[in-house]
Amino acid sequence: RRGFGQTMRKDNWWVAPVLTFIGLGAFVVYSTWAAFQGEHYTFGNYLSPFYSPELFGNSSHALFGPPPSWLPSWLPFSPALLILWAPGGFRFTCYYYRGAYYKSMWADPPACAVGEPRHNYRGERKFPLILQNVHRYFLYLALLFLFFLAYDAWNAMWFAGADGKQHFGVGVGTIVLTANVL
């Protein structure tokens, strides 16, 4: 058996896992910051997908109004923290992402025909990897979110005109929100 990283490959096999590590790592850092900062997630008729659906909040997009008064004042409130666990759980347990972060973050396996760090692979039958099997349940939750995201994309197509009426229009934000649903 080959030791970790040993291979007869001549190509730069390590580039893709390193770039994936940087990309996924940057996304995790950014999304964590975006979820906890709890501000600047709306602009006019646009609502950030990280905050959709906004259940409670101080914007006009909030479905149930302002944050509940029973929340402790010392607890930082962000509308994203109420909902991000569902699409995040779907993405984290998704087969594609599992393959990407297994290779890039755990180097298991690092690439095809490259030595692995361990030789006693147990698959996803033991804790904690058996938790990956909740993917099928997160799918149903993620599908519910598509309706809210589509609704937000539709709302993003209507802009307040100078006459005070709503007018149909398409901006860059509208295109991004619509592409997110598709």
Predicted regions and their residues:
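Membrane-embedded alpha-helical bundles that constitute the cytochrome b-like, heme-associated redox core
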Residues: 1-182
